[in-house]
Amino acid sequence: MISISNLVFRMKKNAVGLATIAILSSMVLVTLVGAASIYAGKKDYLMSAAPHDYSVSGNKVDLTSTKKLMDDFLIKTGEQANEEVAVSYLFFGIKNQETNKLTVFTKNERKVVPKSIVLVFSQETFKQLTGKELNLSSNQIALYTKNKTLKTQKSLSIDGKNYQIHRQLGDFINKKVPNIYKIIVSDYSYLVVPDIKIFESSMKGTSIAQATYVGVNVKDPTHDAKKNLDLLDQIAGEATKQLDGQTPGVPESYFSANSRYDAEGMVNGFVGGTFFIGIFLSIIFMLGTVLVIYYKQISEGYEDRERFV
């Protein structure tokens, strides 16, 4: 009974110290796990942002023009493409959602933050990326979505136009076409439609936009990587200047270049810095925990000496 009461007395007296030890230990674990998770997710993010060694993206330009830039780049560098992906798609932002009814931003709405982003591909592009056919009828679509509500729906309404969801898909553009909007919103969807031109014409007056992507993998991506990216940047910049109907300083149609080498450098800089800070903070928290335990034991020792000696 005496030993139990003594234990309770000590726990009450040292409650602050025990709580500090528990908090610091928890902070060590949280910081380590968080930093390790970010570092481990680096590869997946990189493959999502830059799935190919070199790529050219276009906004409101045709796929043929985008592909020509990549062909010019390969000729000038002497690189040979082991793998190539060339696609054209549409994208738009969602202003509001009520169950399976989506409202799209209008063409004149600027500086908005969408609730969700939708990328639209033709079934021909889907077959090109996956090797599978869908055979969609005129009012049918196939859907991949991160939206929990839409995953259970049988139909979808987009600005009052109704479509039947033929089937739910997996992430068919992963490691093939970049989705840069993942860093803006966590809620996004991919639609596959039977005819992308008909779908685009049905969305007149909305903020829907057209984009192209051409990506290639080469035999030795590290060979002259910086020099090659500078060349690809130059080719894309010169091609953008030659596009018709540009507003000076604010190009609506443009080309942009990217490389996995460049993206990897930026990601490594961010992730490496975060990982270092995580390790550094973990060491500080661990030292704090050790010091609290050490001085707590010393104080208890002096207290016992005064009581029993």
Residue ranges and their predicted role:
Residues M1-V8, G301-V309:
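Juxtamembrane inter-helical linkers in multi-pass membrane proteins
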Residues I2-L18, V56-L69:
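Cytosolic juxtamembrane regulatory segments of multi-pass membrane proteins
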Residues V16-I38, G265-E306:
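Hydrophobic alpha-helical transmembrane segments of multi-pass inner-membrane transport and secretion
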